[in-house]
Amino acid sequence: MVREPLSREEVIKAIERKGGKNIPLFLHKFWGAGLMDKYGSKLEALASNYPDDIFDAWYLEPGFHISSNNNPSYRWGYKDYSHGIKHSIGETYELLDWDEFDWFLEDFPNPNEPGNFDAVEKSLKHADGRYKLGCWWRLFHERFWAIRGMENLMIDYYENMDKLKVLGEKLLDFYKVIVDRYAQLGFDGIFTSDDLGHQTGPMMSPAIFKELYLPLYKEFVSYVHSKGMHVWLHSCGDNTKLMDYLIEAGVDVLHPIQKGCMDEVYIASTYGDKISFLYGIDVQHVLPEGSVEDVRNEIHRVIDIFYKPEGGLLLGAGNGIMPDTPLENIKAMLEELSLYKYTK
């Protein structure tokens, strides 16, 4: 192993910008679909040399349209896809007609579903004194479009805002129970996702975000904080116009600050003393298309931009590393993330 995993205390110092000798690593071994199939034991052997500074545990979420366990009601909505899904993900929504909204709310999954934390509890023996992060995908925006469909959601912002607010409160109640479960098990943070941006800006106007999402975010973050935990948010795309709102809501760590979408120098200089960054190394171009030297230089560039002695920087991959990525580039990334030090 290149170095020992960082302690829980060191990670907390980095998140809270109170110093720390090393930059914590998380999601640096974010393997996309097909990567392990391609490289197999070679990738496993390589990855074993690089520590996970964060222990992450994922509860069993409700299924989309089909239950994720033996309880047929443990899913967000029912659709008969027994013959396969033959259309885009944006059309696999659970709530097609708002006339069914009351029924949908009555049939909401139970956050206290028996067994949904069994795997989390069993995995705790592997935490080894590290920072413990409770995880699930999809918070508000992502859950809204999964329930309504992306096109419907864009219309709902203007025609059905009242219903979205009711749905948001219902989701908030659900998430609070999940947060409670993680808190009872001694977790240090909550990681979740809302891809709020596309390549050139947010998926909704800042005004829509302020009216609909900001109150939900504030209450969610406040609740997590009340349990003594941090909030980590994964949000792809260009979130520049929403940064002030995310900071106002109290988000502690933002991932990935997507390369090509956000101006890293501006983000680091403007917001680096207000929020911490889990910067994600570019998986769209640098890792799959660059040379080993390109990968190393990119990591040097990122650290030199974001590093501060007081902390506030964590490092990983921007998203799932895909199988078109050369193994030598993955090795170079892991080496530099673990060994490179700020030099300016």
What are these regions (language model features)?
Residues 1-344:
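Catalytic cores of TIM-barrel enzymes
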